[in-house]
UniProtKB/Swiss-Prot annotation:
Originating gene: argG
Species name: Saccharolobus solfataricus (strain ATCC 35092 / DSM 1617 / JCM 11322 / P2)
Assigned GO CC terms: cytoplasm
Organism ancestry: Archaea, Thermoproteota, Thermoprotei, Sulfolobales, Sulfolobaceae
Protein name according to UniProt: Argininosuccinate synthase
Residues bound to L-citrulline: Y84, N120, R124, S171, S180, E253, Y265
One Pfam family here: Arginosuc_syn_C
Binding positions (ATP): A6, Y7, S8, G9, G10, L11, D12, T13, T14, G114
Ion transport found in the keyword field: no
Catalytic activity field: L-citrulline + L-aspartate + ATP = 2-(N(omega)-L-arginino)succinate + AMP + diphosphate + H(+)
Gene3D superfamilies attached to this UniProt entry: Argininosuccinate synthetase, chain A, domain 2, HUPs
Sites where the protein binds L-aspartate: T116, N120, D121
Entry keywords, A to Z: Amino-acid biosynthesis, Arginine biosynthesis, ATP-binding, Cytoplasm, Ligase, Nucleotide-binding
Annotated NCBIfam families: argG (TIGR00032), PRK00509.1 (NF001770)
């Protein structure tokens, strides 16, 4: 039997290699997908072999993640419950896709992952695999063995397995779009998140900085006039915005699996780019377009968070987003300082904004007759309803 395991190099999946091998008497093939995490992939490969893998794949998917996933998170202002930029959720279907590709290539009977029965990731991974490879068996060791973190460490030591324990306190998941932090006192929502939990958003600079971001068809293409590939641009802004202490998200999140959790993320580039994109949309879209766009933004964010990347509606929303973002080209100027972020200017050739019309100091004014007629018609529904109801 061959089992292909989605392998991060962390504690859960490292222990899974030996457990799967011994439990199923199987050959274990590990797959690590590079989606922008700052890991030593050579060491991860070595750890996989020592733990018992017969073959290991390291797959570079950074550009694909940026161009096919992050680009749409920007075009569709992907913020789950208005705050979380979907950093972890967004990467899962791509990782699953690469694992399935290896499983098909190797003729594996099963694929495995390290998600627990409490997490959203089990839903995302399982549904992605079912969509891409319906006949393959899915194994989630952590859903079967119910070992605690301490149990896993003990098991690894007993088996002589080298493990990477990211921190005595925290469990970290990281990719190009963000960093999530769990563990220690974070699960108590009444307590402040300790400063030592953060890595990307430690404030280095005390002076404010103005940053110009250029967009073309809804996707950022340049920073301060310098053209960049999207993955490089995101990486650059993670450092730029994070060094000013900006990009922390802490909130109570409604999980897919039926309960609320306290979640903490570092997402400096993600938040900054989405905020800038939203501002350009407000500058360019008509009121009706803007209302419609906000509706599909929320719908898309919910689909991605809930593990429904392969839902047909998500593909339709991408087509709508491509069409609507044809007009979202221009420049947003942002100020970042001391953990804060604000838009300080914007311009676009597609903006209907007219200073001549909008200014109170000069230019066009409607006549008194025009204003009175507009107000009368605008309020007619409400005024007549009040009259007939005797209000």
């Amino acid at each position: 039997m061959k089992i292909v395991l989605a392998y991060s190099g962390g504690l859960d999946t490292t222990v899974s290699i030996r457990w799967l091998k011994e439990t199923f008497k199987a050959e274990i093939i590990t797959v690590t997908v590079d989606v922008g995490q700052k890991d030593d992939f050579k060491k991860i490969e070595e750890r996989a072999y020592i733990a018992g893998a017969s073959k290991h794949y390291t797959i570079d998917a950074v550009r694909q993640f940026a161009n096919n996933y992050i680009a749409y998170a920007i075009k569709l202002n992907g913020l789950y419950e208005g705050v979380y930029p979907l950093s972890t959720a967004l990467a899962r279907p791509l990782i699953a896709e690469k694992v399935v590709e290896v499983a098909k290539k190797e003729g594996a009977e099963a694929v495995a992952h390290g998600s627990t029965s409490k997490g959203n990731d089990q839903v995302r991974f399982d549904l992605a695999v079912k969509a891409l490879y319906p006949d393959v068996k899915i194994i989630a060791p952590a859903r079967i063995w119910n070992m605690t973190r301490e149990d896993e460490i003990k098991y690894a030591k007993e088996k002589g397995i080298p493990i990477k324990v990211e921190s005595d306190k925290y469990s970290i998941d990281e990719n190009l779009w963000g960093r999530s932090i769990e563990g220690d006192i974070i699960s108590d929502p009444s307590l402040e998140v300790p400063e030592d939990a953060f890595e990307w958003t430690k404030q280095i600079y005390n002076k404010k900085e103005i940053v110009s971001i250029e967009f073309s068809n809804g996707v950022p293409t340049a920073v301060n006039g310098e053209k960049m590939e999207l993955n490089k641009l995101v990486d650059f802004l993670n450092l730029k915005f994070g060094s000013h202490g900006f990009g922390r998200v802490e909130h109570i999140e409604n999980r897919v699996v039926g309960f609320k959790s306290r979640e903490v993320y570092e997402v400096p580039a993600a938040l900054g780019l989405i905020y800038a994109h939203i501002d350009l949309e407000k500058t360019i879209y008509t009121p009706m377009e803007l209302r419609f766009k906000r509706h599909i933004d929320q719908l898309w964010s919910d689909l991605v968070y809930q593990g429904l990347w392969f839902e047909p509606l998500r593909e339709t929303l991408h087509k709508v987003a491509d069409e609507m973002n044809k007009w979202i080209s221009g420049e947003a100027k942002v100020e970042v300082s001391n953990g804060s972020f604000r838009i300080v200017g914007r311009e676009s050739e597609y903006s209907p904004y007219s200073e001549k019309i909008a200014s109170y100091n000069k230019g066009w004014y409607p006549s008194d007759e025009m204003a009175r007629g507009f107000i009368e018609i605008w309020g007619m529904h409400s005024l007549i309803a009040r009259r007939v109801r005797g209000l």
